Amino acid sequence: MISIRIPAQVILFLTVAFLLTQCKSKGDEQTHLGPTGDPTIDALTESIRENPSDPGLYLQRAQLFYDHQAYDQAIEDLARVMKLDSTHLRAHHLLADVYLDHNQSAMALKTLQRAPALYPDSIRTKLKLSEFQLILKQYDAAYQTLADIMKIKPGDPEALFMLGMVYRDQGKTEQAIAAFQSAVERNPDMSEAWVILGDLMDRTHDPRAIQYFDNAIRVDPGNVAAWHAKAYFLQNNDRIDEALEIYKKIHELDMQYPEAYLNSAILLLYRDSIDAAMKELLILRQIDPTNAAAWFYSGKAHQFKGEKENAKAAFEQALRLDDTYDQARDALRELDE
């Protein structure tokens, strides 16, 4: 059998042609799109009418459509970008994101697989490709992509970080720790890597885990996930007062962060500080009325106070929100006994 290698540019042309064929009639509508109600999108549409050959305008509008989860419209605009500039790297990256969020993972991967052929030395593109390969559980392909990056830039910290992510996803804890440690050695400002390292150390019952959380906070004092990870470590090691103080700190950093309210409420219930717990749960229910756990623990708080009817109503609401919530079902049964 004779194998014919098709140049990347030809593949890209065929893909762009396919995209444009699929949305040609819609694409014409996109150029002459009527008012959408979004002033920024409408302003870009007017600019496109005046400058229909400017790929940057289509790209900006595609980003806005993507932000609004209008995926089909985003794809159509990105097809226009690629027709005007078939090697537009940012358009490739955005198109892959759109496809992935639009539940078209195969198209997302194909889009990113084309980009390295056009930009073989783009580390950013290869990193994004490895991320998508990880999402799709294509571990061997991800390893190969990361190896390609190491050939271009040996010891690249972001590639080492992604290597750790792949190892972690496969349950290879020791290799993951080694990869993340190598990443932070080369770039100590990688807050997320410090958090993950702390979590992995905690899983192995290594008391040094808290040092990694502290490093993450030192690098990025506003990283709520780092503060939360430290608080969770403390509460799991019976350092309740310290954990509660950190949850207060998280409230200051992000008043809309639900986990801090839930965890602090549970700890307060554990401490028999029922009224304080109920205040936390009330805020949580206001932030996220569909949070079944908030209603369940509200029910427990009412139960501890002897308020049976209020407890029953809260447990029932938890079950309405999540009919698989066995703890709420068991709690209701206990109330009836």
Predicted regions span which residues?
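N-terminal leader/linker segments that initiate helical-solenoid repeat arrays
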Residues: 20-79, 83-85, 101, 110, ...
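Terminal, low-structured helical/coil segments at or just beyond the last alpha-helical repeat
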Residues: 26-30, 35, 270, 293-296, ...
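Structural signature of tandem alpha-helical TPR/SEL1-like repeats
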Residues: 34-43, 69-80, 102-114, 136-148, ...
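Structural marker of alpha-solenoid helical repeat scaffolds
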Residues: 50, 84, 118-119, 152, ...
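Position-specific recognition of the canonical hydrophobic site in helix A of tetratricopeptide repeat
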Residues: 66, 93, 100, 127, ...
